[in-house]
């Protein structure tokens, strides 16, 4: 059990501040001064978490961030299932981004859906010297011949494309005209842009604006009959089928989901989104830009929602219903009431097994704050959290709505810092990504992988909460953790293996 369970708030705050100072001591003075701005202990009543964010990582540290290409291709565009996404540049970026994140979809792979396939222009040295536009044209022609049912193509630029100045926009316009108006989207997401994958999200949002929305032509005959209850799910990547479990609740309360993207999304759904009455935004960090644009240009309001855990689900359903009439408000209450027996059963089964357990998180997007409510519904306490690529508004939301007094906050934490924090705080569970998973498991710390749900899920919605509770119980209470200490060390004082 964590030390947090036996200490007062003041003692925990003092311990965490001391821990930050201890971690910073190993750095050179200049580095320590820079990193100190990213580490803090939350104080109740403050409007933010007191850390600097969205700043370039220090060269030489083991940062856990990605690049702009990862943010565009790997997060925003990649899950659009009926479009082919070209990793334009050397093969490495495509190879190492292939299959690294689950995005479930409905379709026949290689025929009308292409999410799990990897397309690359395989740049060589001669392409750097003489330019890659001719190779890109050849790749586009091959895709058009081999995959004729694709509904569009995106060109995801890797670093060399921006460095040598290839005109991918001109190629896109030319080939689109040649293919009879096919949607071809050039995305300037070279990895050297920005400080993390976050700029890649923004660039991808801008590409949707400039190459999808701005090219929509006024319709003669509408493609579908609009209703007052049309909504679009934005920023759910359907990692474990989460968009589907969320969609069930929205439709049960009387709304019609006309688009969901990017997870299990299509080009047609992108094009239909400007006709929604409300955009409901799951991942604020990666999709708030396009949501704000649609509010400004099309007058579509948007709201952020959280379907992790029953408390936040009920809160979000009522928040969404507030944009509609009494029919939808009554529908929201009906849905909450319908699933209450399931919630009660899950909590009755798992809360006694998880009550008082402590958690430290370090993930991307919205999860450093959104999953806190689900843990608290199970009686667990989040004692530390941080964002890989968060901005100041993420930390404001975290401080104002999620974390408790004395919570340890760490932005762009590196491998050294995170390991030292876990050693000293001794949480019962650490939730982070695949790069951290095996480090902490070898330290004897239960670890659910919180980027892809450890190939479980969904975790969204009421059904997802049952799976989430089961997985957290399996992680924390697995008998294997009793076997991590050598028998001849059993008599020693219990502590983390890494501290030995």
From Swiss-Prot:
PANTHER family on file: NITROGENASE MOLYBDENUM-IRON PROTEIN ALPHA CHAIN
Gene: nifD
GO biological process: nitrogen fixation
GO cellular component annotations of the record: molybdenum-iron nitrogenase complex
Protein name: Nitrogenase molybdenum-iron protein alpha chain
Catalytic activity: N2 + 8 reduced [2Fe-2S]-[ferredoxin] + 16 ATP + 16 H2O = H2 + 8 oxidized [2Fe-2S]-[ferredoxin] + 2 NH4(+) + 16 ADP + 16 phosphate + 6 H(+)
Keyword Metal-binding: yes
InterPro entries: Nase/OxRdtase_comp1, Nase_comp1_asu, Nase_comp1_CS, Nase_Mo-Fe_asu
Subunit-structure text: Tetramer of two alpha and two beta chains. Forms complex with the iron protein (nitrogenase component 2).
Residues annotated as binding [8Fe-7S] cluster: 67, 93, 159
Listed NCBIfam families: N2-ase-Ialpha, nifD
Keyword Iron: yes
GO molecular function terms attached to this record: ATP binding; iron-sulfur cluster binding; metal ion binding; nitrogenase activity
Enzyme class: oxidoreductase
Cofactor note as given: Binds 1 [8Fe-7S] cluster per heterodimer.
UniProt function note: This molybdenum-iron protein is part of the nitrogenase complex that catalyzes the key enzymatic reactions in nitrogen fixation.
UniProt: [7Fe-Mo-9S-C-homocitryl] cluster binding residues: 283, 451
Record-listed E.C. numbers: 1.18.6.1
Keyword vocabulary terms for this entry: ATP-binding, Iron, Iron-sulfur, Metal-binding, Molybdenum, Nitrogen fixation, Nucleotide-binding, Oxidoreductase
Reported cofactor(s): [8Fe-7S] cluster; [7Fe-Mo-9S-C-homocitryl] cluster
């Amino acid at each position: 059990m964590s030390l947090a369970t036996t200490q007062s708030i003041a003692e925990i705050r003092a311990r965490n501040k001391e821990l930050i100072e201890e971690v910073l001591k190993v750095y050179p003075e200049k580095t320590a001064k820079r990193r100190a701005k990213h580490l803090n202990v939350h104080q109740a009543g403050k409007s933010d978490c007191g850390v600097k964010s969205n700043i370039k990582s220090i060269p030489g540290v083991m940062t856990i961030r990605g690049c702009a290409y990862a943010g565009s291709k790997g997060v925003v565009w990649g899950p659009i299932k009926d479009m082919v996404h070209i990793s334009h540049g050397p093969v490495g970026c495509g190879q190492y981004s292939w299959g690294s994140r689950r995005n479930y979809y409905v379709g026949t792979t290689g025929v009308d859906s292409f999410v799990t396939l990897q397309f690359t222009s395989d740049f060589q040295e001669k392409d750097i010297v003489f330019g890659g536009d001719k190779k890109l044209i050849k790749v586009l022609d091959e895709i058009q011949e081999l995959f004729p049912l694709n509904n569009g193509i995106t060109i995801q630029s890797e670093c060399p494309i921006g460095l040598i100045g290839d005109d991918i926009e001109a190629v896109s316009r030319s080939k689109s005209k040649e293919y009879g108006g096919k949607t071809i989207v050039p995305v300037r997401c070279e990895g050297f842009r920005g400080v993390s994958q976050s700029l890649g999200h923004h660039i991808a949002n801008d590409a949707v604006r400039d190459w999808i929305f701005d090219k929509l032509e006024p319709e003669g005959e509408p493609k579908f009959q609009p209703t007052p209850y049309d909504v679009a799910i934005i920023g759910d990547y359907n990692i474990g089928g989460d968009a589907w479990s969320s969609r069930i609740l929205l439709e049960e309360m009387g709304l019609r989901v006309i688009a969901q993207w990017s997870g299990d999304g299509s080009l047609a759904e992108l094009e239909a989104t400007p006709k929604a009455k409300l955009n409901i935004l799951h991942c604020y960090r990666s999709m708030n830009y396009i949501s704000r644009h649609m509010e400004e240009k099309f007058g579509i309001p948007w709201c952020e929602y959280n379907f992790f855990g029953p408390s936040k689900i009920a809160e979000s359903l009522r928040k969404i219903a507030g944009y509609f009439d009494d029919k939808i408000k009554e529908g929201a209450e009906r849905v909450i009431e319908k699933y209450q027996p399931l919630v009660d059963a899950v909590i009755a089964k798992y809360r006694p097994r998880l009550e008082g357990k402590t958690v430290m998180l370090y993930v991307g997007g919205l999860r450093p704050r959104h999953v806190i409510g689900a843990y608290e519904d199970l009686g667990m306490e989040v004692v530390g959290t941080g964002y890989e690529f968060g901005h100041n508004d993420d930390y404001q939301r975290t401080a104002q709505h999620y974390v408790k007094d004395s919570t340890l906050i760490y932005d762009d934490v590196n491998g050294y810092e995170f390991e030292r924090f876990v050693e000293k705080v001794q949480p019962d569970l650490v939730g982070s990504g695949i790069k951290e998973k095996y480090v902490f498991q070898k330290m004897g710390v239960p670890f659910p992988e919180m980027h892809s749900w450890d190939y479980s899920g969904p975790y969204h919605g009421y059904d997802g909460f049952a799976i989430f509770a089961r997985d957290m119980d399996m992680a924390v209470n697995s008998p294997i953790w009793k076997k991590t200490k050598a028998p001849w060390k059993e008599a020693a004082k219990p502590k983390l293996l890494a501290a030995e």
